[in-house]
Amino acid sequence: MDLHLRGKRVLITGASKGIGAAAAEAFAEEGAHLLLAARSGDQLKALAERLRSAHQIDAATIVTDLRKPEDITRLVKEAADIDILVNNAGDIPGGSIDKIDEAAWRHAWELKVFGYINITRAI
């Protein structure tokens, strides 16, 4: 399927595994160039190498934590002129709502709400 993404620049947060890695694969299949961001550098590098080899695209990586303003600043500098942002970083606490402590909820919200807002505003 041609989604007319060839040559587009895509930033994907949380790209090292799961949905983020699957999104990276899908964009690479369409010929998009990728900036892959996550906290786990080894997984990012392996994914980028595989996608570059399989799809002849540019795929750069940056280790980042969206809860840290300095990491967002650094990421935005690397992501100059992106066409598409995929906010995918992080997971949420599992379990019953009455069993999850406030610290776990705050941790998740710092990333999945404020991290997403901050990077979207910065870009």
PLM regions and their residue ranges:
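Flexible N-terminal pre-Rossmann segment of NAD(P)-dependent oxidoreductases
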Residues: 1-9
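Conserved glycine-rich cofactor-binding loop
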Residues: 9, 16-17
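Conserved glycine-rich Rossmann-like NAD(P)H-binding loop of the short-chain dehydrogenase/reductase
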Residues: 30-47
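The beta1-alpha1 cofactor-binding region of Rossmann-like NAD(H)/NADP(H)-dependent oxidoreductases
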Residues: 41-42, 62-74, 102
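Conserved NAD(P)H cofactor-binding loop of Rossmann-fold oxidoreductase domains
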Residues: 89-93
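Substrate-binding pocket helix/loop in short-chain dehydrogenase/reductase
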Residues: 96-97, 104-109
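A short, exposed helix-loop element centered on a Lys and neighboring polar residues
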Residues: 120-121
